[in-house]
């Protein structure tokens, strides 16, 4: 179950000068955890993220036979395949509910999946249909959590066509395990626009980094050859999506923040924050691996297609609510199936503080408004919670109703936030 709710009176700030060291990427950590559990030899993950989502992933993979051991800030992983029935808690982690079922099918036993109440509303039809098409037995009352995978220790693989328009995680979840399928996998997407393509590129990069033959064969098609997944020592990059609130804080307050170990090349969509916040008024530079962002006193609106980087939307929307010109954030219809319906939630919360936001078919329109304090609801969504904290830097009296939900990807968010602001 999720952490106990904790309300948070968001502190205001007139600017600051700080360096913020980010923990590891959730997206990379959970992909490397899956590959390490399926590998032919042990692995070591250097600086992985330890948060609710990654703990849920570790617990799930342990129940399927892998072993994990802490070594300082690193994590040692010994692969293994389970042969017992098990119950897996997905929490609200899309990566767990969509990446682990194929792994469960490669184990032997009846593996039950469930999660938080909100997780039962998240799209899962494609995962269940995919497994059934691959010959895996799945038990369910409806094609959503809870369900059970009956693993036989093998998946034939072959050709598979799916509709992944609700989430790129449906593609990544299959690709990550596909090298262990008897015939590998030829996967194609047939449906509406595929969101968050950089996340699929990240999945392919992690696979090839483990010696797997994995490639994109057409605009919406991928191929993974059968074979071993190598053990490896993998450095986990800082989580650039989690950089968003800290970068936004500098922009909206006129402060300066430095983020060390910012990669010059990455598959993380959070790298787009440097460009997007530059367009919204910040001065941004990257020198010797440190990204520096300074607010200029100007906050511009933005018209942007975020289809490839939808998870950045709550942060960009929070900045847009404080901007002096209108914004349009489009290409993000798939956010309706995230931790909550992020489009409806952002519109409701911005408007509740006196802002002017409207839902579009595939996004949000935000105009300058006269904001005031009030309760900002987080909807058990970590990025909604941090969006409220951003607005609270400028608007006095904002109370985030549940800051504890940030533990999903950033366990010490409040400590990092207040240290950045000079309050600790």
Model-inferred region functions:
Residues 1-424:
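Short, structured segments at the rim of ligand-binding sites
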């Amino acid at each position: 179950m999720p952490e106990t709710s904790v309300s948070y009176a968001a502190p205001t700030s007139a600017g600051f000068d700080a360096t913020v060291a980010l923990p590891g990427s959730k997206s990379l950590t959970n992909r490397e955890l899956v590959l390490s559990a399926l590998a032919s030899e042990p692995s070591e993950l250097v600086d992985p993220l330890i948060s609710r989502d990654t703990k849920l992933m570790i617990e799930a993979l342990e129940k399927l036979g892998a072993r994990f051991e802490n070594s300082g800030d690193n994590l040692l992983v010994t692969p293994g395949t389970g042969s017992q029935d098990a119950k897996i808690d997905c929490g609200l982690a899309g990566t767990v509910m969509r990446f682990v079922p194929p792994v469960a099918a490669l184990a032997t036993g009846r593996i039950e999946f469930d999660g938080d109440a909100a997780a039962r509303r998240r799209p899962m039809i494609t995962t269940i249909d995919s497994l059934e098409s691959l010959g895996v037995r799945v038990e369910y009352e409806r094609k959503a959590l809870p369900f059970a995978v009956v693993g036989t220790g093998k998946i034939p693989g072959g050709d598979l066509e799916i509709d992944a328009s609700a989430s790129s995680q449906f593609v990544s979840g299959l690709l990550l395990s596909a090298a262990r399928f008897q015939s590998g996998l030829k996967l194609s997407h047939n449906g509406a626009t595929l969101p968050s393509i950089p996340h699929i590129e990240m999945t392919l990069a992690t696979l090839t980094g483990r010696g797997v033959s994995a490639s994109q064969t057409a605009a919406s098609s991928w191929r993974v050859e059968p074979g071993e997944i190598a053990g490896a020592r993998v450095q986990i990059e800082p989580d650039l999506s989690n950089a968003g609130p800290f970068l936004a804080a500098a922009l909206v307050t006129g402060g300066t923040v430095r983020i060390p170990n910012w990669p010059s090349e990455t598959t993380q969509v959070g790298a787009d924050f440097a460009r997007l916040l530059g367009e919204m008024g910040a001065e941004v530079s990257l020198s010797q691996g440190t990204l520096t962002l300074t607010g200029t006193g100007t906050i511009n609106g933005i018209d942007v297609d975020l289809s490839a980087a939808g998870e950045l939307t709550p942060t960009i929307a929070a900045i847009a609510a404080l901007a002096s010109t209108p914004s349009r954030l489009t290409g993000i219809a798939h956010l309706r199936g995230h931790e909550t319906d992020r489009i409806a939630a952002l519109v409701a919360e911005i408007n509740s503080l006196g802002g002017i936001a409207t839902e579009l078919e595939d996004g949000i329109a935000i105009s300058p408004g006269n904001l005031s304090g009030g309760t900002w609801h987080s909807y058990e969504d970590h990025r909604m919670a941090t969006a409220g904290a951003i607005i609270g830097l400028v608007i006095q009296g904002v109370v985030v109703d549940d800051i504890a939900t940030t533990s999903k990807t950033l366990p010490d968010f409040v400590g990092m936030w207040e240290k950045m602001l000079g309050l600790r």
